[in-house]
Amino acid sequence: MLAIDNIGIALLLTLVAGMATCIGGCIVFFTKSTRSPDRFLGVCLAFSSGIMIYISFTEIFRKAQQALGGDTFKAFLLTNIGFFGGIAIMALIGAVLPEKKAPSSHIMMAGIYAVAATTIHNFPEGLATFMAVLEGGEAAPVTFFALAIHNIPEGFAVAMPIAYATGKKMKGFASSLLSGIAEPIGALLGWFFLKPIMTEAVSGMIFAATSGIMVYLCFNELIPLSLRYCGKKLSVICITLGFLVIALSLILLSL
């Protein structure tokens, strides 16, 4: 039987890893006024898009396929069904929502989608961190530190659109806090309630749908806004930088 002390330590470290998103969220306090969209917002949105697209295809999609059976045709097919299912869900939501006329409305919706998608992604990630620390071994500290570093750009990606849409930097920071706290909550829910029903197949489909949701958000909301505010050339550069930052964090995670 697992000791209560071990469970407490695992939960504490999961909380710390999740709260690393707040470090990324703190960046909003060091930016200039968020009252009106400008070139800097376009840069931030493009950078956030790079982060989310890269992590969707190289981490979340891959995790989904592994959970659904690994390198098999069936697993790849189910992962794609979940991926395009997530896109379809977002498209349906967009179809029933009222049309966004003001720029701030576009930015707010992009921010809300980003918070929702990242939070969903962080629930199972929190459980994974919790279990890795609980099981111990050499992989535990590496998993903890890598996921913590990996969460920093995610916090930035969700905080900036909310800060610009509302003109309130604290609200942007709060959105990163909400996203990060999903990890310890996911650990608790998974450990006490969802473990009996959270099969590999269910987890895989959730990951696949989350991947589709994040990609749809980037191409439908974040990238068009970045093109509007900072232009094509700078958007491409910043998207590529987003790829690079998240790639480095995933390389660290794989050590």
Language-model-detected regions and their locations in the chain:
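Intrinsically disordered, metal-sensing/regulatory segments
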Residues: 1-255
